[in-house]
């Protein structure tokens, strides 16, 4: 289902190429990509609901496509097997783009929840998703891979701004390492 969701997101991104997106489109793209990150969601119902949200959004943007008699295929969901069955160099570069924007979506999602967004970051999701579906060679894909890194830095700055605006500037503090009697709660995390 994660591949199906990714293919639907690619179709949605391509639908926005020359059509105006709604106020909700960026959120759906970011949430959808974030949903496909390892260890974020294993619930099939949640994935199916996200796929439905993507399809509904695409129908809002392009209402005539769903009833078109002479389908062009330009906005259809992308078949992810096209990547997995591709030449190993193309598969590797497209995978770097895909996994890079998935990771970037995690940062963008958390920043968005805190009220911070960036048009450059959001627009790059559409560009990268669309490029994944194009028939491109290694020479054309490599600059996009590098651009993922550049935009990811901008996205990390966005998340830092969101966090420091919401929670203040983090600073190291001393904590007690002594063992106390009684029940306790352990809080862990990573970044």
What residue ranges belong to the model's regions?
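Metallocofactor- and cofactor-centric catalytic cores in central/energy metabolism, strongly enriched
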Residues: 1-191
């Amino acid at each position: 289902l994660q591949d199906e969701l990714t293919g639907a997101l690619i179709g949605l991104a391509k639908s926005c190429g020359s059509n105006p997106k709604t106020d909700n489109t960026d959120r759906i793209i970011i949430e959808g990509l974030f949903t496909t990150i390892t260890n974020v969601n294993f619930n099939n119902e949640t994935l199916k609901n996200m796929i439905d949200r993507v399809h509904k959004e695409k129908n809002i943007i392009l209402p005539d496509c769903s009833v078109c008699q002479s389908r062009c295929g330009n906005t259809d969901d992308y078949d992810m097997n096209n990547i997995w069955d591709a030449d190993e160099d193309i598969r590797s570069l497209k995978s770097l783009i895909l996994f890079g924007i998935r990771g970037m979506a995690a940062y963008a999602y958390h920043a968005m929840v805190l009220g911070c967004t960036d048009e450059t970051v959001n627009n790059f999701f559409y560009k990268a998703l669309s490029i994944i579906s194009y028939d491109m060679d290694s020479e054309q894909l490599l600059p996009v891979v590098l651009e993922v890194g550049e935009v990811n830095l901008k996205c990390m700055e966005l998340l830092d701004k969101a966090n420091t605006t919401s929670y203040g500037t983090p600073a190291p503090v001393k904590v007690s390492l002594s063992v106390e009697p009684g029940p306790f709660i352990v809080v862990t995390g990573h970044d």
